[in-house]
Amino acid sequence: RDKNGNVVNYNGNIQTCPNGAYQKEKSLEILREVLTTHPFDGVFCNMSGFLVVDYSGVYHGPCHCENCKRLFREQYGLEIPQKDDPGNLDYKKYASFKSACTKKYRERLVKTIREINPELAINNLDYIRTESATEIGVAQWQYSASSNARKTAGPLRERPADNASVDFMGFRYRDTSVSAPQLALRQWQNLANAGSVSLYIMGHLGNHQDRTALTASKPAFDFH
């Protein structure tokens, strides 16, 4: 919640924090359900943690939910800062608080997954995930996939590297794919630098209207 206690609602998507029931309890219940009913190879949890902006870049500030306020007050005897200000001494304590909360949640997440299946790959533990993407107003690097895969795999090409080719043009254009040559180039760069073929789309394969990414990426997936 924001400093006024309002829920952060972005077009029906509610932002949560690691100290709320959804991330602490429900997310693990959902994870346990899907991992015991479907044959997954690995897990990547996207955008968990303490988010302060929404997809449109609107700043909402630190979470002021009752759990966060209570825990921070118990540990530091302070109120949560109104805004993110690294120059504020209280904010530095809040940053430490967030780091500790995130670490605890991560430990519970890993424990849950390992109990279900020790062979499941977990992001940032068993493999490293990066992205090759475009965004409005951001300079483009045509060899992004090569750089990411090579950096992650290491000089001996021993570390599992998952560099996801992002289908969409930018968060404000999430339903429109970048060009087919761009998408194909990323996948072949991944393979040439000891990475895996990896595609990131919004939604799921069955209802994805712009099929450009699927068609362009298929030859690399077939080859791999």
Predicted regions and their residues:
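Active-site-adjacent "subsite" loops/lids of carbohydrate-active enzymes
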Residues: 1-38, 47, 68-99, 107
